[in-house]
Amino acid sequence: SAQFKNSEKEEFFYGEHSYVLQGKFKVDSYSKHAAGRVTFTHVPSDYDEFEAIYQVLGKTPHGTAAMMPMAMEIYGRNREVGEKCIRLLCYPSNVNTVLSLLKDKFGSQEGFTSDDGYHQRYLPAAVLEGATPQNGYNPTEPYTVNMIASVNKHQDMQLYDGRVMYIYIMGKGWDTEQRSIEIVKTSTSELCQIFNCPALLTQCKRIQGTWNGLK
């Protein structure tokens, strides 16, 4: 796994919840050796916390990418709050796709549901460090999202003044552990947004054991 210098580490708090950002993904330049890590003690409790964390993590491509599993988990707990988080985090053209896929994967019931083979309420945990189908997708704590650079270099958007960056989030929930996520940064926004992320929303391997949920 990637090694990070202490100088690359930023920690911040929301109440008693801790968030740590590490890594060197840059909007203005591509590096095939770039790596990132976001570690957090809890999933944000509500929209206010999610928005506050986004104001910090959203300044970097990897911080933004790591917030997608958080938004998915919030949506699983509360559709209304989760949708608000997704609309904040995702680029407008991506919002309806994400919501449609999540409704499909989580089913109609909010909160904690058992696995029926198709509906996978544990999907947000499939990209957290330590979570595997074999251990019921129960990740190590504090929760960690690990990321590496995609083989695809940054691309400038043709229609808008912006740039799309490609990142792999690592997850043991699929045969292909590198889950591609596209991050966009426009010239009119200080924060990045998620441009495309179907690889995080596709069927993962069937769970073995019991998922205990996330804090």
Spell out what each predicted region is:
Residues 1-32, 36-38, 164-168, 173-215:
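Short beta-strand edge/turn micro-motifs at domain boundaries
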Residues 2, 98-172:
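Surface-exposed, charged secondary-structure patches
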Residues 3, 22, 49, 55, ...:
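Residue-identity detector for glutamine
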Residues 15-127:
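Core segments of small alpha/beta cavity-forming domains
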